């Protein structure tokens, strides 16, 4: 998996688990944006991201999934231990407006995390907008993007996949 934090913040050692520390860092740092590039052959991303989402699900705020053209599987959400009553999904949005929708959602501060699936890399201007929105809303933003098929010779890190069983 290749992740890229679009926000810089200091991480101090702690006796807390990594997920608890990450959730607390989000609160103290004012929110962050991270990009996860995934590949269809490696399904481990759910094992990495799910514990953090479970921890964030204990907050009083919502978890928002912006997944154009795909719908989350209700049985998967229940089986994963995520709070069904705190899940919001927008899947009938135009992929061209997904970044704008993510920015607006991050700014509201109503969400612990906003997950967004994008087919392309973000521009520098989009990264700045999302970083500022996440900080203003004190929210985690996760940008999920499939690995591009070209340029594999230059790939430095393996990527991960979100199982299609997440959707029905």
From Swiss-Prot:
Return the protein name: Cell division inhibitor SulA
Name any Gene Ontology BP term. Answer: negative regulation of cell division
Q: Which domain of life is it from?
A: Bacteria
Q: Specify where the region named FtsZ binding lies, as residue ranges.
A: 105-111
According to UniProt, residues marked as the site described as Essential for degradation by Lon protease are 168
Q: Gene encoding it?
A: sulA
Mind telling me which PANTHER family this protein's record contains?
A: BLR3025 PROTEIN-RELATED, CELL DIVISION INHIBITOR SULA
Question: Would the keyword Lipoprotein be found if you checked this record's keyword annotation?
Answer: no
Query: Induction of this protein: by what?
Result: By DNA damage, as part of the SOS response.
NCBIfam families membership = PRK10595.1, SOS_SulA_coli
Family matches, as InterPro entries: Cell_div_suppressor_SulA (IPR004596), P-loop_NTPase (IPR027417), SulA_CellDiv_inhibitor (IPR050356), SulA_enterobact (IPR047696)
What is known about its subunit structure?
Interacts with FtsZ.
Q: Which Pfam families match?
A: SulA
């Amino acid at each position: 998996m290749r992740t890229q934090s679009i926000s810089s913040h200091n991480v101090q050692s702690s006796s807390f688990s990594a997920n608890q520390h990450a959730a607390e860092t989000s609160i103290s740092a004012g929110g962050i944006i991270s990009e996860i590039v995934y590949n269809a052959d490696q399904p481990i991303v759910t094992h990495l991201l799910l514990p953090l989402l479970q921890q964030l699900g204990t907050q009083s705020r919502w978890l928002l999934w912006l997944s154009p053209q795909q719908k989350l599987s209700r049985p998967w959400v229940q089986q994963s231990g995520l709070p069904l009553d705190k899940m919001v999904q927008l899947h009938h949005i135009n992929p061209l407006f997904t970044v704008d929708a993510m920015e607006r959602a991050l700014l509201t501060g109503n969400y612990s995390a906003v997950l967004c699936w994008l087919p392309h890399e973000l521009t520098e201007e989009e990264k700045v907008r999302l970083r500022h929105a996440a900080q203003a809303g004190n929210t985690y933003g996760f940008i999920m993007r499939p690995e591009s098929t070209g340029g594999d010779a230059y790939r430095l890190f393996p990527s991960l996949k979100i199982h299609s069983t997440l959707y029905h």
